[in-house]
Amino acid sequence: MDSRQAAALLVLLLLIDGGCAEGPGGQQEDQLSAEEDSEPLPPQDAQTSGSLLHYLLQAMERPGRSQAFLFQPQRFGRNTQGSWRNEWLSPRAGEGLNSQFWSLAAPQRFGKK
């Protein structure tokens, strides 16, 4: 989660918490209701705010490619680790393998039957 998403979530939580604390009647009505009943909030309100928060978190996630798609070890072959530049590409890459290459090469007959 990047900083913009975290800031948006924090602002959203503060707005939700502030709306629950003040309510539609303001602070005077809140004091009266606090004197009348000092019971905790019913579990339905907690579930509603939790489900709302869960929905908002899912909505904030950007649909895109999974992390498994971005990690592609097969792109450079199996069990390749370290720097491939030193192993495969060198200034004189063809000279060391010359004898091996020509021993495996078979003559090609282009166009002759």
From Swiss-Prot:
Q: Which residues form the signal peptide?
A: 1-20
**Main location (coarse class):** secreted
Query: InterPro entries from the xrefs?
Result: NPFF
Name the record gives this protein = Pro-FMRFamide-related neuropeptide FF
The record's listing under Pfam families reads: NPFF
Where, per the database record, does this protein carry Phenylalanine amide? 76, 110
Alphabetical keyword list: Amidation, Cleavage on pair of basic residues, Neuropeptide, Secreted, Signal
Name of the encoding gene: NPFF
Q: Where is this region: Disordered?
A: 22-48
The family database entries (PANTHER family) matched by this protein are listed as:
NEUROPEPTIDE FF, PRO-FMRFAMIDE-RELATED NEUROPEPTIDE FF
Identify the GO cellular component terms for this protein: axon terminus; dendrite; extracellular region; extracellular space; neuronal dense core vesicle; perikaryon; postsynapse
So what family is this one in?
A: Belongs to the FARP (FMRFamide related peptide) family.
A GO BP annotation: regulation of membrane depolarization
Q: Which domain of life is it from?
A: Eukaryota
In its UniProt record, a GO molecular function of this protein is: neuropeptide hormone activity
**Which positions are listed as propeptide?**
21-65, 79-92
Annotated compartments: Secreted
State the protein's purpose. Answer: Morphine modulating peptides. Have wide-ranging physiologic effects, including the modulation of morphine-induced analgesia, elevation of arterial blood pressure, and increased somatostatin secretion from the pancreas. Neuropeptide FF potentiates and sensitizes ASIC1 and ASIC3 channels.
